[in-house]
């Protein structure tokens, strides 16, 4: 299937008047053009810095956009998190994540509506923007996120698991959970029969991550679950967890 994006569609994405519908569109956004469109009073030097960063990875450019907005006195999270562009709402995530005065608990509270955003991309930026804090204090993050695993919102339940993945996608690894994944077992147990496939995928991926360093532990957990849990959801999670192990 072709991933070519029509010119008019790309213009709308770069103007901030449309949200992306798939990953290829997310990656195709011209950050300098979007920044200039949504924050027209930014100094030209700021736009040039973003233009010069065009070849960098997308997570680096997300963080840079937030930094440029903050430096220009335009770092109002509430303003940006209400924007129609999912990329701009992602910048709001990075504004929260880069707040040096906020504790992790404060950041998680501020991030909550973005972690529950209707757009798939914003929900990913929400945990990626906090990843450095989580890596720096994984047990604190685990304690703070345990209650999220019991929330009515499937997005928040998934966030609780995805944010703590030992490896993750586009993310710094969490060394403690790679070597001692048992710390997270109570949270995984909470989600072990989750009815939503979106959450099941995250739990299965979490265990598969852990299995790259601790395969015997993952096999033991799955064997126990096989004998104590008979849900279709858990069977799916176990299959996903054990793939490639």
Regions found by a protein language model. Name each.
Residues 1-245:
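Surface-facing alpha-helical segments and adjacent helix-coil boundary elements at the starts of domains
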